[in-house]
Every structure is written in C-alpha cells, then in structure tokens.
Amino acid sequence: MRVLNIEDDTFKHNDICKALSGCGIKDVEWSNNLADGWKQIKNSIDSNNPYDLIITDMYYPGEPGGREEQSGDILIDREIKNKITIPVILCSSVNLKYPEIYGCVYYSRERNWEADMQTLVNSLVAG
C-alpha cells in the first residue's frame, strides 16, 4: 500500500509511520505543506500510480515556509471537487468528524490513537 502523509510536524509524521508499520505499511511519502502535497497527489494520478491512501493533518502551511492554516479542509474540498477517489484519513489533534472522507483519527498522547489508525487502515486493506 502506497501512502502520502501530509503533516508539518516531524514527530507526528514519525508516529504515524510507526502506526502504519504495525499494519505492514512501509511505503509512506511525506509532504509538509498543501502545495507540495497536492502536486504529489496530482503527479501520482497523472503517472497512473495513484496513492492508495492519503493521511492529512488539519492545520499545516498552504505553501512551503508559509503559516499554519486549515489546509486539511482545503485538501478535502479539492479531492471532492476534482472527484479524486483516493481514501483520506484525517489525523488531527482536534477531534473532528468528516463524514465525506474515509475516516478521522483523534491524535492525542492521552489515548490509543494508533489503534484507531490501524483499525481504519486494516479495514481499507481488507477491502
């Protein structure tokens, strides 16, 4: 399974990679801003090798070196408007619900968010 993680926090990205490795997933590409992440998504589709899953935070820069904004929302809207069918998991330290995407994970060190992530990913892999 090929995954793109759009996340500006290196430590959280590494945590997500560890959770995914518990599902046997090692192929995780990373972007830390919306502009580059969107290019990676479009390039994967244009090259006929789309990602199997996109994991996105809610708050990260829209552009390289930019300020943090609600870029996850923009990404989800773009996916819907462009009819992109790659499943999206929102992994945020804000407990959010988005019924139009594959799933949401509430990232918090006080809870077992890894199990929530692994349940969603394993369900996706199982089809």
What are these regions (language model features)?
Residues 1-12, 16-20:
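Conserved acidic segment of CheY-like receiver
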Residues 90-92:
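Hydrophobic/aromatic residues positioned on beta-strands within the core alpha/beta folds
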Residues 97, 109-125:
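C-terminal output helix
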